[in-house]
């Protein structure tokens, strides 16, 4: 969803997901500015330990899809952030049946289907964008953290 069309309800849901992740990972979530390429920074003891782009999908079940679409720009941003900051960068999707995540750097882009998707029912020329389809087998369901705090 474009940050320009994101609603307060969308932000509240994303914040709720960020708080759940932070509790599981023993961190503090910090929301970034609206135009940032990552939604949330995760801090522990005043140190950055991870970043995430979070999407909340209402009235949808993860199991009904064979893949999840990710904006190609979001993937680039997450991978670049991970390289620069040397912390894990995650793409997180919240569905009605759970919260699922994948570490961006583990996605082999050459094995993903690339397409152009978006809203075709709106007149704006900026409604479509390149996306990659990430197979469901790459996604992990939120669970207890490992010894380092994050499931790798």
Predicted regions and their residues:
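Catalytic micro-motifs at enzyme active sites that drive phosphoryl/nucleotidyl and oxygen chemistry
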Residues: 29-30, 39, 79
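Alpha-helix C-cap/termination motif
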Residues: 24, 43-46, 81-85
